[in-house]
């Protein structure tokens, strides 16, 4: 199948999933064309049958905000016409599904099919803004196929966008179990922490919804009882606020800001605990990646996280903002080697339910169904 993929190429869940899916599809013999404004973040090496098409957005004084969605529509049209795309997989409803529909209209209705994957904030945040709600709803409903990364996100879409539930196929995110495992890389502990220190990790785009400050507050309480170091991976608008809080709490010397990292698997494989204190998560891909590396996860009980993290089995769940509870759960594991080993093994075992070998064929099957209609 010739597949176009339109996505945000940046550091974030939807872009990561789109890129990893494209790589897996290419491995399985499909021809994949990424259509976006920059090379996808995790597409850092040559992969046979993968092509990248840059969306160019000319700057004109007339436009205070250059219309990327229009340039994307034309780029999709050009790639579809030149390479004979069978389908366009839009990751994130706006503007990708919108631009795909425009491209399809320009080519005439009998061309590629559109499959839109809903990832989270396109439904729970951006799409519910009055400025974008109508176009988000239109774009989803005009798609030939719709997938959501969790049952939670499917329910939200049905409730807020009047989409028939039978039109939405839930296909969860997946993880490469060969790359994400505890023994996949040489141990970097000595480069990241002092001997005897436990390594606690958080990875995000440092936006307010991720509540990175809660991760620092949890760590501050844990570090009073257990020698430990907090690794903060990623970057974003909240970083300076997080740095100031670490200084205010007196833990800045034990908090390492690593910025954006292309290969988080190496960091997760030597971590002892992963913190995900988000206010909202449609799935929690990074929690799954941590679990695959045998790292117990302490997360908030929101959105699709309970579909991945089972409280008391492969991690712990707590209410949003309950930093004391999260700290207590962290200490329970970090002070009891047997409890940690049991939860680490359970985390890896449960992550296997979300292997690429299990999930990617679900997309292939859905592609076939959609093309056959």
State where each predicted segment sits.
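Conserved donor-binding/catalytic core segment of Leloir-type glycosyltransferases
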Residues: 193-219
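Short hydrophobic beta-strand element within catalytic cores of glycosyltransferases
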Residues: 296-299, 309
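Aromatic "clamp/platform" in nucleotide-sugar-dependent glycosyltransferases that forms part
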Residues: 260, 279
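A short helix/loop element that forms part of the nucleotide-sugar donor recognition site in Leloir-type
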Residues: 180-194
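N-terminal strand-loop element at the rim of the active site
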Residues: 7-11, 23-68
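A short, well-ordered alpha-helix in the C-terminal region of glycosyltransferases
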Residues: 325, 332, 339-353, 362-365
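Carbohydrate-associated surface elements
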Residues: 152, 174
